[in-house]
């Protein structure tokens, strides 16, 4: 397969210093000639730093990004067992449509893999109405012969074929009860993300899939990179934005084949293929509480503002993550919850955080017992609890019970 060329198929290629063209962006409904094939079209698509093109040329361009991402690194073996994660968002439908198209090509152009689809039902956790089952069933018919499954977040043993699925009772969802024990929205969102990743890994193992396709695009990866650093997972931030994330248990590999697509390209693809997302973008847990409610919300709002005003900056942010070296030491200990690398040495910053926490917990007794708080802070950091700094912060917020 070919790889992405900067001039034609990068997010902005070498156009980071270019002045934005004065031509209108978006779908031009007036007829015109395609700049690629010179065919007159009644609907032209105008992307940033690209000339207006017809529907067929745009779809070819977008699908090439998907194929090139997988082909450049040659990380998907022939006839691999693939699990595609569907959450009902526009980007997950684009990934489903692109994979289905790649599977229905002739023998030479066909993407040789065996795909299954799992819909992760999160509506219970988000306290929203359940997904429209009829719309989900119609998707399974439209994208046959893919096998469709449904699993509910917080219900570990709820994997069912879509034709057999029936929603479970909200009162039995253990994840909802554990989220209620966490004090801050930052901790809830972080814990929910890690639980979701671990759930998808368990589904892949039960279906004997070696690779998982996740529908993250460039703006998602830029947000994930900054969030990981802010939460204290900087040592593993590179894997949060990489095409291949091999931290999952059971030798399951997580792939992000849409990493080079922008939000604008996703919306254009949805329009071109007349796809109907099950949910609107920005419907993640806790997003409705505003940008200042959590660290994740604030980071997402910051990146969204960058995307709106300085489109090429977002590409620069997440591509910086690709340049961060990953610690490939096989003996490096990892967090038992999020699989991030554990700190091998005591950090002055972490020591200061634990010292501050010790002072807060000691309170008025600090003047009575005169205990060495610095030694206490060091002892806490040296405890072999198997958790990274970010997961220890979640554990500290739990009113009762264990993180795992």
From Swiss-Prot:
Pathway the protein acts in: tRNA modification; 5-methoxycarbonylmethyl-2-thiouridine-tRNA biosynthesis
Known function: Plays a central role in 2-thiolation of mcm(5)S(2)U at tRNA wobble positions of tRNA(Lys), tRNA(Glu) and tRNA(Gln). May act by forming a heterodimer with NCS6/CTU1 that ligates sulfur from thiocarboxylated URM1 onto the uridine of tRNAs at wobble position.
Keywords of this entry: Cytoplasm, tRNA processing
Protein name: Cytoplasmic tRNA 2-thiolation protein 2
Family annotation (HAMAP family): CTU2
GO molecular function, one term: tRNA binding
Subcellular location: Cytoplasm
GO cellular component, one term: cytosol
Keyword Cytoplasm (UniProt): yes
Main location: cytoplasm
Keyword Calcium: no
Species: Drosophila erecta
Biological process annotations from GO: protein urmylation; tRNA thio-modification; tRNA wobble position uridine thiolation; tRNA wobble uridine modification
Gene3D superfamilies given in the database record: HUPs
Family per record: Belongs to the CTU2/NCS2 family.
Database matches in PANTHER family: CYTOPLASMIC TRNA 2-THIOLATION PROTEIN 2 (PTHR20882:SF14)
